[in-house]
Every structure is written in structure tokens, then in C-alpha cells.
Amino acid sequence: MSFPKYKPSRLSPLPETLDPAEYNISPETRRAQAERLAIRAQLKREYLLQYNDPNRRGLIENPALLRWAYARTTNVYPNFRPTPKNSLMGALYGFGPLIFIYYIIKTERDRKEKLIQEGKLDRTFHLSY
């Protein structure tokens, strides 16, 4: 019984087990993969030694995570592009609430002042005019 030839779908990539590049790897690529695996194993061993240390004091700091967080917080401009949409949203979120609160307070005071001038508002505890 013969199986039909595998045809990759347009929506999903070729599985790694069927990829010929998975098995035809150059020695340099294999060496680089082995070095990365050794570094990963060494870092994992150091972390586990720190994690399982019974005399541990404080937190275990991950230097890669610290570098990543520092780069994200201090290096904003390579990751941010000012566009008209960003500018408009910044203005709306920055000035929109201030204008809205000003409008509410102003209309409420104007309405109250109009009722006071017409004499329709009962001001039992008023201290001014």
C-alpha cells in the first residue's frame, strides 16, 4: 500500500519531521546548535542551583530578563513610531478627560447660578450673597 505524497497546506507550514532540511544539516550548524544547547544547559543548571539552595537569601535575578526589561523601558523610540492616530489618541486621552470634567462642572455651576438668580433654589445654609 503506497501513501500519497504529502502536500503542505497553504495555511499551515510543513511539519519539521517532513522537512528535508531537518536532517541535512551542515556541521557548522550542528556545532552552533550544540553550543547553544550547552549554554542553555549551563544557565539552567546555575538557575536550579540558586533555586534549590537552602541558604538562599532574597530573589534570584535573571540577567537576561533584566536586560530585556531595561531595553523595553529605556529604549522606547526604536519601538515607537509617531503617527497621526497615535497623536490623536494621546491628545484625546490626555486632554479629553480634562475638557469633559470642565464641561460638567461649568454647566452645573451655570445651571445653579441661573436658579439662584431666578429665586427658585432653596439655599437654607448659604453663607455668601
From Swiss-Prot:
Localization terms from the record = Mitochondrion inner membrane
Protein name (Swiss-Prot/TrEMBL): NADH dehydrogenase [ubiquinone] 1 beta subcomplex subunit 4
**Stated role:** Accessory subunit of the mitochondrial membrane respiratory chain NADH dehydrogenase (Complex I), that is believed not to be involved in catalysis. Complex I functions in the transfer of electrons from NADH to the respiratory chain. The immediate electron acceptor for the enzyme is believed to be ubiquinone.
Which terms are listed as keywords in the entry?
Answer: Acetylation, Electron transport, Membrane, Mitochondrion, Mitochondrion inner membrane, Phosphoprotein, Respiratory chain, Transmembrane, Transmembrane helix, Transport
* Disordered as annotated region, ranges: 1-26
Q: What is its main location?
A: mitochondrion
Topology in the lipid bilayer is annotated as: Single-pass membrane protein
Q: How does it assemble?
A: Complex I is composed of 45 different subunits.
The source organism is: Pongo abelii
Which family is annotated?
Belongs to the complex I NDUFB4 subunit family.
Q: Which GO terms describe its cellular component?
A: mitochondrial inner membrane; respiratory chain complex I
InterPro entries in UniProt:
NADH_UbQ_OxRdtase_NDUFB4_su
| Spans traversing the lipid bilayer | 88-105
